[in-house]
Amino acid sequence: MAEVKLLGFWYSPFTHRVEWALKLKGVKYEYIEEDRDNKSSLLLQSNPVHKKVPVLIHNGKPIVESMVILEYIDETFEGPSILPKDPYDRALARFWSKFLGDKVAAVVNTFFRKGEEQEKGKEEVYEMLKVLDNELKDKKFFVGDKFGFADIAANLVGFWLGVFEEGYGVVLVTSEKFPNFSRWRDEYINCSQVKESLPSRDELLAFFRARFQAVVASISAPK
């Protein structure tokens, strides 16, 4: 039987994408938790360019970058399709995946800014949410009638964003401002396939609050 290993961080939305795909396909795998501050030689050898997770190792061969890994899993293993079969729908799914990937840094960085810089960051995130809200009008999922590639690409805004908001005390999403996105987010969180692989919300809150405090302390420390 093919050997499959996944190197990841338990708190990472990018690791979660791969876990979701493997479970959807019914692939048995060994999960290896990495230490952010002391990365293993296996990780550094498997991803020498970026030195980051997730990394999927299949029969000794490493595949990196979460959305690339998802396509690899979809093409390699039997089971339900992750990408749509229709070429146009596949293109749409890849478009929204790229759009969301380009916005990840803006979403995360907003929580580590203060004052005017944070307000600028919020506006950038609001613009992204407006686009998503408009796209999700009268739609249950991003592409087609089932949860798929584009939806899992949106996992950071689907679940982690809410954790960041609560942990850092910065509210970006309300059902009044973004009703369609909020409805989709509820669908995302309650999707049985997703719930099975999501980390504990309470543990994530504790982890990110501690990280936030550490960042603030380092910024405030005398030089």
UniProtKB/Swiss-Prot annotation:
GO terms for cellular component: cytoplasm. It is an enzyme of class 2 (transferase). Coiled coil: none annotated. One of its GO terms (molecular function) is glutathione transferase activity. Induction: By auxin. Keywords: Auxin signaling pathway, Transferase. Residues 2-81 form the GST N-terminal domain. PROSITE patterns: GST_CTER, GST_NTER. Residues 86-212 form the GST C-terminal domain. Root tip-specific expression. It catalyses: RX + glutathione = an S-substituted glutathione + a halide anion + H(+). Glutathione binds at S12, K39, V53, E65, S66. It comes from the Eukaryota. One of its GO terms (biological process) is auxin-activated signaling pathway. Its EC number is 2.5.1.18. InterPro entries: Glutathione-S-Trfase_C-like, Glutathione-S-Trfase_C_sf, Glutathione_S-Trfase_N, GST_C, GST_C_Tau, Omega/Tau-like, Thioredoxin-like_sf. Gene3D superfamilies: 1.20.1050.10, Glutaredoxin (3.40.30.10). SUPFAM superfamilies: GST C-terminal domain-like, Thioredoxin-like. Belongs to the GST superfamily. HSP26 family. PANTHER family: GLUTATHIONE S-TRANSFERASE, GST, SUPERFAMILY, GST DOMAIN CONTAINING, GLUTATHIONE S-TRANSFERASE-RELATED. This is Probable glutathione S-transferase. It comes from Nicotiana tabacum. The lineage of its organism: Eukaryota, Viridiplantae, Streptophyta, Embryophyta, Tracheophyta.
